[in-house]
Amino acid sequence: MLDWRLASAHFILAVTLTLWSSGKVLSVDVTTTEAFDSGVIDVQSTPTVREEKSATDLTAKLLLLDELVSLENDVIETKKKRSFSGFGSPLDRLSAGSVDHKGKQRKVVDHPKRRFGIPMDRIGRNRLSNSRG
């Protein structure tokens, strides 16, 4: 079954290739293709003018934005900054370190230090001697 499919696929490709090489696959008139080619050339030639115009517009806009940003950076804030961080305070005046994360806070309980008995050696049978040596 697979051999039949492979043979038919090769036959269809061979027929398509022969028709395409003879020019009978697409029934498109030569005048239509010439008109299409000239339209493509016209469309390709106009974007260069449009691209130049848009490039100059973009550079002008970028220069204007750059100037506005530099003017904004030069302005000194006269309003007093709030000393607390919370809801209602402007986001640009909050520092990242002052933001409190709301969540479950666990109480830290100080446990008294556990005192173990007499120190044992590794095996645990004999007491360690207090004398050196």
From Swiss-Prot:
Pfam families: Musclin. Keywords: Amidation, Cleavage on pair of basic residues, Developmental protein, Differentiation, Hormone, Secreted, Signal. GO terms for molecular function: hormone activity; signaling receptor binding. InterPro entries: Osteocrin. Residues 1-27 form the signal peptide. GO terms for biological process: cell differentiation; cell surface receptor signaling pathway; endochondral bone growth; hormone-mediated signaling pathway; negative regulation of D-glucose import; negative regulation of dendrite extension; negative regulation of osteoblast differentiation. Induction: Expression is induced in the developing cerebral cortex in response to neuronal activity in neurons: expression is driven by the presence of a enhancer sequence only present in primates that binds the MEF2 transcription factors. GO terms for cellular component: extracellular space. Hormone that acts as a regulator of dendritic growth in the developing cerebral cortex in response to sensory experience. Induced in the brain following membrane depolarization and inhibits dendritic branching in neurons of the developing cortex. Probably acts by binding to natriuretic peptide receptor NPR3/NPR-C, thereby preventing binding between NPR3/NPR-C and natriuretic peptides, leading to increase cGMP production. Interacts with NPR3. Belongs to the Osteocrin family. This is Osteocrin. It comes from Homo sapiens (Human).
